[in-house]
Structure formats: structure tokens, C-alpha cells
Amino acid sequence: MAYPTLEKLFHVDRTSDRYENLQHLLQQRISSESTFRTGIYLDSGELFLAIPRELSVLHERVLRRERRVSALWKGLPTIALGAYIRSLILDEVVYSNEIEGVRSTRRDIEIALERARRDTSSLPGAAGKAHAPFAEFAQLYLNLTDNPQQPQSLQDIREIYDSVVRDALDKRDRLGEALFRTGQVVIANKQGRVLHTGVSPESKIEALLTQWIALSQSDSIPETYSALLCHFLFGYIHPFYDSNGRTGRYLLALQLSRPLSQPTVLSLSRTIAENKNVYYKAFDVTERPLNHAEGTHFVLTMLGLIGDAQESLISDLEEKQSSLDELEVAVKQCSNELSRRACDVLYFAAQMDIFNAFRETRLDDVAVWLGVSKPTSRKAFGELGAHDLIIKTSQRPPVFELTPKGRNLLGLM
């Protein structure tokens, strides 16, 4: 029998003592030597995590898959790594938005990032003209590659939230001088049933978020477990009027980037978007009064979603690695007809075709990679164009992609 919720055990108990029996079961779970108690009290009790066999097995499988992900990741060339991580980041932002019903596309996010890169006034805290929506949100995920510091204060959490919603939030939902919302929020479904009532007043929000920070930094609980419990707790607190989900999922990615690989972390929102009902039910089950704030089933569900994300990632990496192996052979066979530099550019463009979100190759990037001037790079692109292997798709900046002939020659059709 799978590890049952306390609520389920209560309902199968037909005796007149079922309330007393439920309290006995609760005490058994919460007082077990293997249980992690948080000391954080919610409306239905102290948030805690029991460690049943199922959870240990799921966690071990996640760690085992991480070894496979890391091995595949380390086998990729630098060009492919950079292109793939950016593609994952674009997807992560798009799918995190989608979960909340906010429409965006990969191209929207890419354009926002490019505008932000060109306009230094779009950096967090800088004054200046407005910039494209989602620029700072996407930049948060890009910065994960630099191992940013975890939130140390309530102000840090607010600043992360501001980056998530800047220029993408209705003015009516923006906060004033207070760090967090001062009014009440109630989440209901289409039928009007209340699904969740956010914590209030603001003083209680601040108190629970202070405990959230302590839990996120605790060295007395495995980091994966604390990250997942913190994800539930942030959703439970619901500290803002809007965009709590996107802020919470970024914070989850930030925390999981310590025990797990970046590719895994950046694949999670897509899996959540594909399993939204499972994801939201995990919150609902944990909040039910008869479950007395046990976080075990939430962690079990999230570990399952992480596992699904890993499986999809591994499959995609293996497929791309196979294409890369065939590509290297194909490029070598072109050396009789093309100059060495043209072959290098072709190899770069082919990697972008496999790993880049838009299959695009920028002349500026190639020049930097080759360590040559832009005119020298342009000459190599011209040689490939003369053989109908590559075509220019943008003048400013100069952007190219493989032609059907080029893709067919390299076995990428």
C-alpha cells in the first residue's frame, strides 16, 4: 500500500474513536526519529516531513538520474552548452508564465533579453526608460548560472518579486510602500469553491517568511527536502496579490540549483505545466485540515515531477548527443570542398541548429568564438552561402541559419 495521507486513514476508520486514532497516527509520524520537523506552525499544525520508504526510493532515483544528466552535460561542446542552457531558460520562463495563464513565447523572452542587454537602464534598481516585459524575470534565470546568493532578508524576497513582475503587472495589483500585501486574498475555482486563503495580516506574512528563510538555510535537513517544503510554504503564505506562483517557482529553482544540476532545475516548469492538476492538488492535499500540515505528500509529488523532468531531459540530451556525433563526421567530410574556417563556421552553425531555440547563428558570436575580426567571419559565411549551405535571415544584427541543403548535408533533416 502506498504511503497514505492522514486524511485517508481517517476516512477508512469506521470506529467511533477515529478522531483519537487520527491524533495517535499524527503523533507517530511527527515524533518518529526520521521525521524532519520545521517548527513552523500553519493553521492545521506544524509543517513536517516524514520519511517513508517511498520517499527515500524516489529521492535516490532523482540523485541517480542526476549522475546521468551530469555525464551527458559534460560531454557537450561549449557552443552547445551555451545554446542549450539559454533554450532551457527561455522554456522555463514561458512555461512558468503559462502555469499562471500569462501568455509569452520564446521569441518574446529572447527579444526582452536582447533589449535589456543593450539598455543598461533595464538592470535591477537602475533608473531609466521602461523595458520589455519579462526581461528581468528571464534575467533572474540567466543569473542562476552564476550561483546567486539565496534570499537573506525579507527585502531580498521583495526585490526578487519586483524583478518577476516589473513591467508585466497591472498597476492595480502593484504593491505600495509595504514589502508585502496588506489586504486579504482568497483563491477560488470557477465554481466559487475557496481553494486557499492567503496568510494575513502583513505581520504574520513577515513572521512566516522569516521562518521560510531560516528553513531555506537550514543544514539539518537535506537541501532537496527543504527546497520543496519551502516551495509549499511560499505558496501557502501567498505574500503578494499577484505572481506568487512565478516568484515561488523561481525561488524553487534557486534553491534546487544547490543539490541538483542546472539542466534539471531549468526543465521543471515545463513538467509542472504539463501536470498542473497534479501540482496544484499537492498544495491542496497538504493544506487539508485532517492532514495536519504534513508535507510528505507534497514532497513525494514534487520528487515525482522532478523525476519526470529528468527523464525528458535525459532523452533529449541523448538524442542531441547522437546528432552531434554524426555531425562531427559530416563536417569532416566537407573539408575537401570548404576552407578550414568555413568548416569551423559550419560546425558552429550546425550546433546552433541542434541546440539553439531558434536554430540561429550570429556573426558576432562566431567571430568571438573563432577569435577573428567580423570581416574575416563574414568571409567564411560568404563561402558557405556560395555553396547554398547557409542563408542570412537578419541584417542587423547579422543572423544566419542552415539551408535545407546544409541541414541535409549534415544529416540534420
Residue ranges with predicted function:
Residues 1-413:
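FIC/Doc superfamily catalytic core
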